[in-house]
Amino acid sequence: MVDTAKNTKLFTSYGVSTSKTVTPEIAAKLISKAKRPLLMVGTLTLDPELLDRVVKISKTANIPIAATGSSLASLADKDVDAEYINAHMLGFYLTDPNWPGLDGNGNYDTVIVLGFKKFYINQVLSAAKNFSNLKTIAIERGYIQNATMSFGNLSKADHYAALDELIDLL
């Protein structure tokens, strides 16, 4: 019988790359060290508990918000720096190093995503993963494999606790 399990050294650099799981502590450090972070939020942030945490993250770390879908309406009276943009267009713009950003001060180095359906945000982050050096951190309830780093699959209670821990560490 031929042993086909030996010599498993890789000689290529291609293949599927997936995100690394991240703890709230590490995510907070990465967000704090980012030169130009952007918080990208989706329509799932219409949930009042999640919306409250989005506002706290933005205010605590002084991060502008890219509001996608119908999320801008809920942020209008929260005294945060939020701009509307289509999520797919933002994903496209983030791959362009010459894009001026939402505020005209240049492209971002780190994008934090929260409040999206898993199948949707994975498609948006696919371009950023494959065509840019952008660091993306998914602080979603589900594991997002096209992000650079992501929380694992969490229950709703654990997700809220992880977000609270992240806010405390920012």
Swiss-Prot record:
Pathway involvement of the protein, from the record: One-carbon metabolism; methanogenesis from acetate
Listed GO biological process terms: methanogenesis, from acetate
Domain of life of the source: Archaea
InterPro entries the UniProt entry points to: CdhB, DHS-like_NAD/FAD-binding_dom
Listed HAMAP family: CdhB
Subunit and partners: Heterotetramer of two alpha and two epsilon subunits. The ACDS complex is made up of alpha, epsilon, beta, gamma and delta subunits with a probable stoichiometry of (alpha(2)epsilon(2))(4)-beta(8)-(gamma(1)delta(1))(8).
Family note: Belongs to the CdhB family.
Identification of the protein by name: Acetyl-CoA decarbonylase/synthase complex subunit epsilon 1
